[in-house]
Amino acid sequence: MKKILLHTCCGPCSIYPLDTLRSKDFEVYGLFYNPNIHPYTEFKKRRDQLAEYAEQQNWQVIFDDEYRLDEYLQEVVHREARRCQMCYNMRLRRAAQIAKKGNFDAFTTTLLVSPFQKHELIREIGENLAEQYNIPFYYEDFRPGFKEATTKSKELAMYRQQYCGCIYSERDRYCKPPHRKGGK
């Protein structure tokens, strides 16, 4: 059985990838490393929900419990146009490092389940890091299971967030652009 490290952004997004990988006879371990999540209360909700789901699924997850917002901001400030690229790179780099050190056969991410993420960019970064760290990036398009996972997460009354986690996506989700008077 091959051992794979699944970088995990939250409980709901882990449902379909975890089930799929297990059905393919992978021994799946999770990694919760998400320095992008803001504010701390959101980070804690996502972390706690994942811990609860992992226990229900008898799934071992490595939790980086340190709130690393400063590290994330140092990566993206003044690079806002490339913030998703920087964020994916941070999180997948940590997954590749841990997978390599832990003698995993591959690493992947739950980010591949969301139709709202930049799928090809995630794949490209994962493959580049795989080459850099000499550990395979397992690519699978998990998006076909997004609706199924959403339904299941609602049935399980899981905490479901409304934005990717970063302060920029929170702004984009909730803040309406100001109306301008007298012009376009």
Question: Which role does the model predict for each range below?
Answer:
Residues 1-184:
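Nucleotide-activated chemistry modules centered on ATP-dependent adenylation/adenylyltransferase
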